[in-house]
Amino acid sequence: RVLPFYNHPGARGEDSILSTCLTDYTVKRIPVYTFHDGFGFYGSLLKGVLPLSLKKISLYDSALITDRFYRACLGWVRYKPLYTYLTQPEEYDRIMEESKERLEKSLPKVCAYFNRSEFRNLSEELQFYEKNVQSHYKEFRDAQRVWKKAVEKTVADGLVPQNPGSA
């Protein structure tokens, strides 16, 4: 019942990649409040205390914020080719061309806004991961096969019950 959590090298989006495997599963929405403290501003969360108000985050206040945003962007452009290949294979070439064009148009503005030239690397990263999408796809499928064998062996060896709710 548990599926492998695959992430190709240096990319983000492992939850999105996992979602492509859920077609034959019942996915339940559980209404819970979650809070992602991406910058470590709310230490009280670890004690179970939620903030009453949120701090305003300015892109100009901290290189940490800009660095984190840059790394997130890198992760996004790295996972886009594989995610698109998995979810829209018939439209893959068109979507990737459109994405590259839009990225090329927007990067000069992004670099100027953040006053950081390294955002230009996003275009090269997208092209690299697009070029390697077949390899990443094969790794993803290999991970699924290996995981399936491991689960089958674990069940066959009696290490876990075959129907987890029935024990």
Label for each model-derived stretch:
Residues T20-H36:
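Catalytic donor-sugar/metal-binding loop of nucleotide-sugar-dependent glycosyltransferases
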Residues L50-A167:
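Terminal low-complexity segments of carbohydrate-biosynthetic enzymes
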Residues A11-I17:
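Acidic donor-binding loop at a coil-to-helix junction in glycosyltransferase catalytic cores
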